[in-house]
Swiss-Prot record:
GO terms for biological process: protein refolding. This is Chaperonin CPN60, mitochondrial. Keywords: ATP-binding, Chaperone, Mitochondrion, Nucleotide-binding, Stress response, Transit peptide. Implicated in mitochondrial protein import and macromolecular assembly. May facilitate the correct folding of imported proteins. May also prevent misfolding and promote the refolding and proper assembly of unfolded polypeptides generated under stress conditions in the mitochondrial matrix. GO terms for molecular function: ATP binding; ATP-dependent protein folding chaperone. The keyword Zinc does not apply. Residues 636-700 are annotated as: Disordered. One of its GO terms (cellular component) is mitochondrial matrix. It comes from the Eukaryota. It is found in: Mitochondrion matrix.
Length: 700
């Protein structure tokens, strides 16, 4: 009986334990809603961890590629790196030299590629990843740009000549020769050769001379040459030529009444948002004064009216202060007003109709009502870097004719030769007008390529009118070699270095050391320049498919008079001038001058400092989105992320992360309300930052 009671008691206790134990377990177990919330929270936290790891991975790669200090290169290595960049530009640009020059295709970020043979445009588009070599590229771009700005042509010849002189000079410097006397020899040879070329020049006299220069400069396009020659034939040597696009496939020449003068845009910021290298406004008003505009208040009444009416305004003055320029530029950049500023540095332009700014400021009320009567106006205004063209309205033809008659009367009365020349130029400019060449083409690419040719040809003619012309095809360069001009240069060097009784010169000789060594090195520099003059003719022949070395030998060994050369179009040796193959003297001089200048600078460059940049070691790993990325990324980049945790702890943490991610991938959950998510994100961000700092140590 007793045992039975004990048995019953145990059964009751067991049942009670089962009952209450199940209840506790049930209470401790979360319901479905809580479990969804917890799992979603864990998923969000781990996604933030992965996102944070991605972000730090990218930051780490960006940090690797950031510039860290400077690389400093000395001596021969420095010059050799510059030479590689110079030769890179030369090897590309020289392919376009001559009437049989090849084309170069330029890839554009948008639109179809551009196929051209314009040397300066090709050089501008060359850029190398290697910073050291790219400095050499920039030097070549500077050389070609100067030739293009000063002479309008000869950029391909400049690039080739610069590379040749630089290469020969560096070869001598690398043999431990002193570059300073070599530089002196190069500079002296450059000056003497330029003077020699000027003595060989022939002035422009006839229509045929202009036609020949324009044809050669436009890559032997006779039709282009005729259009340009016709423009100069009608308007004279001071002709203003404007290039524009034509909807037709053919080129067209038009003449309009207008006036142009050699003054251009005062500040490049005025070109902002114009998408071209000049500004063109229609129905523009002009304010002309012979005063300096030093205070913005003096022209404020005009600016307010034109800003309100959104009309373009051109201000032509003697000079502008920095304050006025800054104010005008800022307002133009904001789009508040269309304004142009042109500096004349001269008083004649407004001697008759110039506006008195003091009277303008004192009579603001009257100006508000009749401002147009105080200002000039033009149908079209085109302002380039160094030239302004005003196309007048038909209604002003009577006033223009009256002004021309006044100038003619002044021309007859004056006795000064200088005044007669200037008055004649003004009469021609007012009466001649402006030539407008409308350029056609079968495609946009062809149209742009033809426009580059027209620019070269018009610039070449303009420079030739100033100095004259010489035989083309590189014959003038070969004449320097053929006439044994190097002996005159050597003689000049010896005369400059000969010993005299002058104490100052004796001290100089003591400083430079061996006189014979100094003399020989200067002669070496002169020899480098003269021996490089044949590369132009060689390359022209090579581009035409002929052996350039043989062509040069035949010309140098010929007993014909100056002008004998090779015509690649007919494959015959002819008199270049008689065949119309001529070059602008200014172009030839510019090639010699700029080539020797850049080469001299490179030879005396002993050190180069460039930004140091690490090479990119790869791109973002695609496995970054995989479940195993956390542990893989941590092991691979552990040493780069400055993580000092123990290896065992790393493995445990990575395994926990992987387990959490695997669990999360098995379930899909619904989105909750936006307010709840924002609250969770705020809390989780703090938790994540703490966990990232404590567990992964990324932010150190």
């Amino acid at each position: 009986m007793r045992m039975k009671r004990i048995h019953i008691l145990f059964v009751v206790i067991f049942l009670l334990c089962l009952r209450y134990g199940y209840s506790i377990k049930k209470k401790r177990s979360p319901n479905n809603k809580n479990r969804l919330f917890i799992n979603k929270r864990l998923k969000y936290i781990n996604s933030k961890i992965i996102s944070r790891r991605k972000e730090n991975y990218v930051k780490m790669k960006m940090t690797e590629n950031k510039v860290k200090g400077k690389d400093i290169i000395y001596g021969n290595e420095c010059r050799n790196e510059l030479l590689k960049g110079i030769l890179t530009v030369s090897d590309v640009v020289k392919l376009t030299l001559g009437p049989r020059g090849r084309n170069v295709l330029l890839e554009k970020e948008y639109g179809s590629p551009l196929i051209i043979n314009d040397g300066v445009t090709i050089a501008k588009n060359i850029s190398l990843k290697d910073r050291k070599k790219n400095n050499g590229v920039k030097l070549m771009q500077e050389s070609t740009n100067i030739s293009n700005d000063k002479a309008g042509d000869g950029t391909s010849s400049t690039a080739l000549m610069t590379a040749t002189i630089t290469k020969k000079g560096i070869e001598q410097v690398n043999r431990n020769h002193n570059p300073i006397p070599i530089q002196r020899g190069i500079q002296l040879a450059s000056k003497m050769i330029i003077e020699k070329i000027k003595s060989l020049s022939t002035p422009i006299k006839t229509y045929k001379d202009i036609l020949n220069i324009a044809t050669i400069a436009s890559n032997n396009d006779v039709h282009m040459g005729q259009i340009i020659a016709n423009a100069y034939d009608k308007l004279g040597k001071n002709a203003a030529i404007i290039l524009d696009d034509n909807a037709d496939i053919n080129d067209k020449l038009e003449f309009t009444e207008g006036y142009n003068f050699d003054r251009g845009i005062i500040n490049p910021y005025l070109l902002y948002n114009e998408n071209k290298d000049y500004i063109e406004y229609s129905n523009v008003s002009t304010l002309i004064t012979d005063q300096n505009i030093d205070n913005i208040q003096s022209i404020l009444p005009i600016l307010e009216i034109f800003a309100k009416n959104k009309q373009p305004l051109c201000i032509i003055a003697d000079d502008f202060s920095n304050e006025v320029l800054q104010t005008l530029i800022i307002n133009k950049l904001k789009g508040a007003i269309k304004v142009l500023c042109i500096v004349t540095n001269s008083k004649y332009i407004s001697a008759d109709v110039g506006l008195d700014l003091n009277n303008l400021h004192n009579n603001m009320s009257s100006f508000d009502n009749n401002y147009l009567s105080l200002l000039g106006s033009a149908n079209t205004l085109i302002v380039k870097k160094d030239r302004t063209s005003l196309i007048t309205k038909e209604e002003y033809k009577k006033e223009i004719d009256e002004r021309i008659n006044v100038l003619k009367k002044e021309y007859e009365e004056t006795t000064s030769k200088y005044d007669k020349e200037k008055l004649n130029e003004r009469i021609a400019a007012l009466s001649g007008g402006i030539a407008k060449i409308l350029i056609g083409g079968n495609s946009e690419t062809e149209q742009k390529e033809r426009k580059f040719k027209y620019e070269d040809a018009t610039n070449a003619v303009k420079s030739a009118i100033d100095i004259g012309y010489v035989p083309g095809g590189g014959v003038t360069y070969l004449e320097i070699i053929k006439s044994n001009f190097i002996q005159e240069i050597h003689k000049k060097i010896e005369e400059d270095l000969q010993i005299s009784s002058n104490n100052d010169e004796k001290k100089y000789l003591e400083l430079i050391g061996n006189l014979e060594s100094e003399m020989e090195l200067q002669k070496m520099g002169a020899n480098i320049v003269v021996s490089s003059l044949d590369v132009i003719t060689k390359q022209i022949a090579d581009n035409a498919g002929v052996n350039g070395d043989n062509v040069v030998k035949i010309i140098l060994n010929s007993k014909d008079k100056y002008g004998f050369g090779y015509d690649v179009n007919t494959n015959k040796f002819v008199n270049m001038v008689e065949k119309g193959i001529i070059d602008s003297t200014n172009v030839i001089i510019s090639v010699i001058k700029n080539s020797c200048s850049i080469a001299s600078m490179v030879l005396t460059t002993e050190c180069m400092m460039v930004d140091h940049e690490k090479k990119d070691k790869g791109i973002l790993d695609s496995s970054i989105n995989s479940p195993n990325y956390l542990s893989k990324h941590r092991r691979t980049y552990k040493h780069k992320l400055h993580d000092d945790e123990d290896t065992d702890e790393d493995d445990e943490e990575d395994e926990d992360d992987e387990d959490d991610e695997d669990d999360l991938d098995d379930d899909d959950y619904d989105d909750e309300d936006e307010e709840d998510e924002e609250d969770e994100e705020d809390e989780d961000d703090e938790d994540d930052e703490d966990s990232m700092n404590d567990e992964y140590n990324y932010d150190e």
